[in-house]
Amino acid sequence: MQIAKNEMKIFSGNANRELAIKVSEYIGTRLADCEVGRFADGEINVKIGETVRGHDTFIIQPTCPPVNENLMELLIMIDALKRASANSIAVVIPYYGYARQDRKAKGRDPITAKLVANLLTVAGATRVMTVDLHSEQIQGFFDIPLDNLWSFPIFAKKLKEDKIVDDDYVIVSPDVGGVKRARQFAERLGGPLAILDKRRPKDNVAEILNIIGEVEGKTAIIVDDIADTARSLVNAAKAIKEKGAKRVIACITHPVLSDGAIERIQNSEIEKIYISDSISHSNLPDKFSVVSLAPLLGEAIVRVRKNLSISILFRQ
């Protein structure tokens, strides 16, 4: 009797099918047959349309808004693949929803990022891949391998192509928590670093107290992982411009863009904003430029499949 060959199969939910198609095309394969629909009462119905027994499977599904719908789709897809005897189930979550709920900021707060990690693991995921986790300590919430991929190489490449870094420039971290991300960006480009000192009196509100570093007369490139309402981003751009920056550019990995964020950015001091396609958006204004994560995710998936190093992707 012939033994079935262990193949790689890539699945996608409904959260960002466009990105999943780009990733599969980069790898040189097709998306596996899977239908994620709804029953009449709204319950999620997953139908796997081909065999996965003994195969290495990858599910591409960011848990972006509507976060609970997309997370539940992902969990049910994992369960379906596990019960169909997949050899491995790697979940590729470009944007990890609930990542900002990673600690108890005050009494009786939940740590929802940990809860999501538990749900993914119990459902049957054997590996998680994500991009620019909001808090790196979330990696410790998992008892299965987690690959936190960095987006800075693709943004740095795009900035060079668009000649943004031909002028005198500075990489700006919008807060102390993002310094490591901004420093990696600055090291990749070989440029200086500035840091905004800010505090948050309440959720989605930030007050800038000081700018550490020189921005006067320079192209300031703000590097951040998430733009939700974009109030913090717009305020940062305003403060930088008031300090004499020649122009302000932004690089944002995860464009949540809720609560009027697009209009807010349009009317801000930001000249150009580069975003990834971790979250799908359509009909964006010309000020927005989308940089695809597909090559990064595709390369990482291939390396996981072949048991090759992933960290080499982020070395100089």
UniProtKB/Swiss-Prot annotation:
Residues reported in the UniProt entry to bind Mg(2+) 2: 175
Intrachain disulfide bonds: none
Pathway: Metabolic intermediate biosynthesis; 5-phospho-alpha-D-ribose 1-diphosphate biosynthesis; 5-phospho-alpha-D-ribose 1-diphosphate from D-ribose 5-phosphate (route I): step 1/1
Reactions listed under catalytic activity: D-ribose 5-phosphate + ATP = 5-phospho-alpha-D-ribose 1-diphosphate + AMP + H(+)
Protein localization: Cytoplasm
Note on how the cofactor is bound: Binds 2 Mg(2+) ions per subunit.
A Gene Ontology molecular function term of the record: magnesium ion binding
EC number: 2.7.6.1
SUPFAM superfamilies per the UniProt record, alphabetical: PRTase-like (SSF53271)
The protein's assembly and partners: Homohexamer.
Function: Involved in the biosynthesis of the central metabolite phospho-alpha-D-ribosyl-1-pyrophosphate (PRPP) via the transfer of pyrophosphoryl group from ATP to 1-hydroxyl of ribose-5-phosphate (Rib-5-P).
Xref: NCBIfam families: PRK01259.1, ribP_PPkin
Protein name: Ribose-phosphate pyrophosphokinase
Gene: prs
